[in-house]
Amino acid sequence: MMIFMAIAGYGLSVCAEEDQAIPYSATAIIPENQLNKNVSYFDLLVSKGEKQIVTIQINNSSNKKIKIKITPNTAKTTRNGTIDYSGMDLKNTDNLKYQFDKLVSKEQVVSIEPHTKKNVDFVLSIPREEFPGIILGGFYIREEKDEQQVESLNKTVQITNEFSMVIGCQLRMNEEKVPKDFQLNKVKLGTYGGYFSIISSISNVSPSLVSFYSVEKTIQDMNRKEIAKFKKEGISIAPNSIYEAPDKIEANKLNPGKYKMLLTIESRDKKNKWRLSEDFEITSKEKKGVQNEAIPSTKISNRKIIYLVTCIWFGLVILLLMILLLRKRRNRDR
């Protein structure tokens, strides 16, 4: 379970099981050069060549001593169209000049006594050259368990929650907005969640954050006949990052041959649109390889049939039991 105090939506999102207490919390100590004082993440106006200390306060609300690992990471974009600050193996664009994790001191592991607070300092080394837009990253915070704790958890059958938190950090040298710019790099077959899919590689090549945009895609054959259409809402893309956007599609709709992907990106306020296109080709070898990896459609329908038959069978058993009980009651009454 992860708690976000990040920038991908400009808010705080918390999800937790009601019966489980969160063992610790983390708070950004807001400095004087914070631009937006109403948010719980770092939004810093910085000057070139300076060094700055940023502080995160960890509060151990549990009854035991804990170790907390805090790792600075550069913001990237997941296949779901969300911002990731946890250090997942995702791609940034080639024109990303400064990675957040390279500008911050190394990750730290700190021990905190029960029911106490501890301040953890990180040093930001701001680039000597002025940069446009924003540099975006975050501090990924999670509990570090020792070997004994891990072994103990492995021996238990129960499912346990692992809590983690993210505090976002946005660096900028001015408040000027940078024009957004996108590129459609490559379109290829692949799998998503085990299903046969078409994957479009979309680059946000500007140092600006994309929040809650819509992405519409249309696949055409070379005769401009529409093969498939997709639309996703609420897409967020980190600055200078690549969004590998997957869409599930039936394999029989994409036979080997040449196609065109038409893509429209629209801003949240509907005021700006970007139209991109890319020709792509599907080979027999590529399609066969992806089909071998994907869940066969026959297997999916068989599962549905088994589920339906099982439900009907249980329904008939319950109905039969009810009839037998009613007959017994009638016999007793007689």
Residue ranges and their predicted role:
Residues 310-334:
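C-terminal membrane-anchoring or membrane-association module
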Residues 59-64, 75, 129, 203-209:
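Short solvent-exposed strand-capping/beta-turn motif centered on an Asx-Ser/Thr pair
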Residues 172-307:
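Membrane-proximal extracellular "stem/stalk" segments
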